[in-house]
Each structure stands twice: as structure tokens, then as C-alpha cells.
Amino acid sequence: MKYRISDLKREIRIALDQNKSSEPLRDLGDIDTLSFDDIVGSKIADAAKIVILHAPIHLLGSGIPFGKGIEWKSAEGHGSGSVLLPDDFLRLVVFQMSDWSRAVSEAISPSDAQYALQSSRFPGVRGCPQKPVVAIVNTGVGMMLEFYSCTGGEGVGIKQATYIPKPRILDETIELSHKIKDAVVYYSAYMVAVTMGQREQAQQLLNISQSLLNDTTL
């Protein structure tokens, strides 16, 4: 859902209990020439990114499809493969190959102990169609999603693959799942309070943002 930045700024100011959106800041060093409104606006995209990375997956929506081409490590439909991720990739929503019994929403990284197991000579410890594993790695051509693994042979392909992109402000709007919008507002307010040196207020706002992400009614 698209939200207007002006509307989000207003909600952030309400969260901070501020009424004057253009009041200049004082005694804040290099940023004392910025208006309060400028500082509020500068936090929204970063706050959205952090919230997206930490939110439960069911709050993020269905995501955007990806995965136009597969690179197989050996033969098509056998073993592991990889898919180039979009440049604006931020978080995986779901990935499933057509011969897998279930989808995967949590990816590992090369620093995880489980990643080394995917190269083991013992097949029982590697990912398989019944217990699939995906990893996100940085390569010379960009970020890749590696999947482990397939046994279905020729004709195996991607059944479903979606992701959440990095949040960007375009035409004074930002795309957010409606289920995380309030958490983004309070996290933005938290970041503003930190900038203003209001530590106690910042902690309260952070607690509210985190509690919104843990709300089981969403």
C-alpha cells in the first residue's frame, strides 16, 4: 500500500507529541540548521528498512515475484542451483522449487554453520525436497539465492518465489504493508528522538514499535 510522506510525517509528529513541524532544532551541532520536519522525513525510509528486516513474515504481504532463470550446479533438476536476486532485494518472503514438499521463508547465510553442510559429501545432512534449504550470498554479479536441493530431474522449476524490495520514497510516497505501517511510524519517531537526544522518549517509542510487530491480532 502506498502512503504519502506528508501523512506519515504528521503521524510521527503526533507520536513525538510535537505540534510545530518547522521549529528549528537547537544545540545539535551540524544538524541545527535543519527543520524538525526535515529530520522526521529523513528517517522514514531507514526506519521502514529496519522494520521490514525484523517483522514477522506474515506482516509483510505477498511480495514481488522473482526468479526468471535458474543456474544448476550440475544437471537440470538434480542437486543445487542458484537464482540471481533483484537489485532492490531486501528480504525473502517465500521460495519453493516444484519438486519440494514445502516452501522456505528463512534463508541462511555463508556465516551459518548449516551453510557448510550443504557441501558435505554426506547427502543426509544437505537440503533436500523434504527439508529444503536456501541461502543468500553475495557474488561478483550481485546477490544470489542458492537452493538445496532438487531430485525431480528435467522440467523442475520454480513453483513460487517472492521478495520484499528495499523501501524507497518515490513521488513523495512510500510502499509499505499496512500491517507494519504503525511500527514504521513509531520506529521513525524513535530515530528522531535519538537524534534529538531524548533517550527516555526514544526507548518508549522503540518499545511501542516492537510491541506492534509482536501483536498477534495483526
Give residue spans per PLM region.
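Glycine-enriched, solvent-exposed interface loops adjoining structured elements
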Residues: M1-L218
